[in-house]
Amino acid sequence: MTEYKLVIVGGGGVGKSALTIQLIQNHFIDEYDPTIEDSYRKQVTIDEETCLLDILDTAGQEEYSAMRDQYMRTGQGFLCVYSITSRSSFDEIASFREQILRVKDKDRVPMIVVGNKCDLESDRQVTTGEGQDLAKSFGSPFLETSAKIRVNVEEAFYSLVREIRKDLKGDSKPEKGKKKRPLKACTLL
């Protein structure tokens, strides 16, 4: 059975733990208890393939940022989560992505941009279009989710697994700075 190492990143209070617990335990946690680092495992079937999701729920608070490099090194794919009710959490996503790319020394890493708390439409500070544009600029899928009313929760994690699978199939591509040289044929006369 294939195991996928998923890492969920984003600012404090955007709902990373709520999304993860909704996926794993099918319930919504409404009290805010800042995470330092939690790990969850769940066996699921995605596109008729049974696999094991190893999900690392990370700290959003800046005081734990020193821990980020380590989990970014080991993760295969990343859910970059912001809250649609927080402009600042949206603005942080680009720096999370840059840090991931730097740590992994790659131009592209399997990633999905997630706008959480879509049930709080009246408090929206970030439009759906802004989220779509950001994800498009990254070459990543985009979803709006709600851990509270369970909108697109499974789809967010499953889409990330599909991105990892695509990446693994194309893994023979050269990494940043390492270009494959074309084969040259010589003709002797």
Curated annotation (Swiss-Prot):
Lipid-substituted positions (S-geranylgeranyl cysteine): 186
EC number: 3.6.5.2
Ligand binding (GTP): 10-17, 57-61, 116-119
Entry-linked SMART domains: RAB, RAS, RHO
Main location: membrane
Regulation: Alternates between an inactive form bound to GDP and an active form bound to GTP. Activated by a guanine nucleotide-exchange factor (GEF) and inactivated by a GTPase-activating protein (GAP).
GO MF term list: adenylate cyclase activator activity; G protein activity; GDP binding; GTP binding; GTPase activity; guanylate cyclase activator activity; kinase binding; phosphatidylinositol 3-kinase binding
Gene3D superfamilies: P-loop containing nucleotide triphosphate hydrolases
Subunit composition and interactions: Interacts with ripA.
Catalytic reactions on record: GTP + H2O = GDP + phosphate + H(+)
Protein's recorded name: Ras-like protein rasG
SUPFAM superfamilies with a match to the protein in the record: P-loop containing nucleoside triphosphate hydrolases
Coiled coil stretches, renumbered: none
Cited function: Ras proteins bind GDP/GTP and possess intrinsic GTPase activity.
One Pfam family here: Ras
Family: Belongs to the small GTPase superfamily. Ras family.
GTP-binding as UniProt keyword: yes
One term under GO cellular component: phagocytic cup
Residues recorded with modification Cysteine methyl ester: 186
